[in-house]
């Protein structure tokens, strides 16, 4: 799978993607990850990616022009031809903006000394894009992270894991120009709270998706026993020693009876879900033995 991110802070991914399972997935060739800097698709000396909001208000809004240009470059990078670097503005001509310049916008200034370095960076970026995308057969499935999006869950992670190529476009500051959302195949939200940036949210989604890929956890069935894999919370886990500070490991786990262990784990998953996340049980199809066990828990609660 190819996973790409487009943001103003690509360095934020280094520690997460360079450690643990994310690193292993890349070393095994299961994952090809690349974080792109949105500034490589800007054309002013300050490499501006944001501006004041129309209508006034606090904060800065990410401009849609660099996002569209970057998206088009990434979509073109399918290994079917070379990619031209972003065009530099002519003398006295600024980068085009979808709805015109804001009052006081400095993006219309002519090319300043030193701007060639931005072009060189863009060329290198596009070279990286082309190399990574040689294994991509189609344009990326594009995801924005925003509060108005679909609530992310394990089912969503499984769906995304079936894609060949994912592109996460990450907001920052006050948000993203609404017109950029026309590029989205899907908008995802982690929950009803605010984060500093879309980079943080994308890391959570990427981790959840990558661990679903065959071979990442060491076996095809590696993720099947995790929480939410079958709609239930995971059963309690224990390791040595069998006794610690007077707390004992359940005897059934020491019995060697695999059938009894399996049933204990199933009942623990059911009970934990019943007590902590009963909403997950709504509409779930369960075998008769599971329903009888849940009924016994309900009866206990009424005593």
Predicted regions and their residues:
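Internal, active-site/partner-interface "lid" segment
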Residues: 200, 212-255
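N-terminal nucleotide/polyanion-binding subdomain common to many enzyme families
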Residues: 1-75, 259-274, 278-282, 303
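Long, intrinsically disordered low-complexity tandem-repeat segments
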Residues: 87-90, 95-126, 130-131
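SAM-dependent methyltransferases
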Residues: 1, 127-133, 241-303
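Hydrophobic/aromatic beta-strand patches that form the interior of the parallel beta-sheet core
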Residues: 4-6, 34-36, 141-143, 166-167, ...
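S-adenosyl-L-methionine/SAH cofactor-binding core of RNA-modifying enzymes
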Residues: 63-92, 123-166, 177
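Structured adenosyl-cofactor binding patch, chiefly the S-adenosyl-L-methionine
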Residues: 176-227
């Amino acid at each position: 799978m190819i996973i790409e991110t487009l943001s103003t802070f690509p360095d934020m991914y280094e520690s997460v993607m360079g450690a643990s399972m994310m690193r292993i997935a890349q070393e095994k060739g299961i994952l090809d990850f690349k974080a792109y800097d949105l500034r490589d698709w800007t054309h002013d000396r300050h490499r501006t990616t944001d501006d004041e909001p129309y209508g006034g208000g606090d904060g800065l809004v990410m401009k849609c022009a660099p996002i569209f240009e970057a998206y088009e470059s990434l979509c073109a990078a399918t290994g079917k031809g070379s990619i031209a670097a972003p065009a530099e503005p002519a003398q006295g001509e600024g980068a085009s903006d979808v709805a015109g310049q804001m009052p006081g916008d400095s993006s219309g200034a002519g090319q300043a000394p030193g701007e060639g370095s931005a072009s060189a960076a863009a060329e290198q970026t596009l070279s990286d894009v082309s190399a990574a995308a040689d294994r991509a057969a189609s344009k990326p499935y594009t995801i924005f992270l925003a509060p108005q999006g679909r609530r992310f869950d394990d089912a969503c992670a499984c769906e995304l894991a079936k894609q060949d190529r994912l592109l996460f476009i990450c907001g920052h500051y006050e948000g993203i120009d609404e017109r950029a959302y026309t590029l989205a195949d899907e908008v995802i939200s982690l929950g009803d709270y605010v984060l500093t940036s879309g980079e943080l949210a994308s890391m959570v989604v990427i981790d959840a998706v990558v661990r679903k890929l065959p071979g990442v956890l060491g076996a095809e069935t590696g993720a099947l026993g995790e929480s939410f894999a079958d709609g239930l919370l995971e059963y309690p886990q224990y390791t040595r020693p069998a006794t610690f500070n007077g707390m004992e490991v359940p005897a059934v786990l020491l019995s060697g009876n695999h059938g009894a262990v399996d049933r204990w784990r199933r009942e623990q998953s059911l009970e934990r879900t019943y007590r902590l996340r009963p909403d997950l049980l709504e509409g779930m199809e369960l075998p008769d033995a599971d329903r009888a066990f849940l009924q016994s828990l309900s009866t206990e609660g009424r005593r």
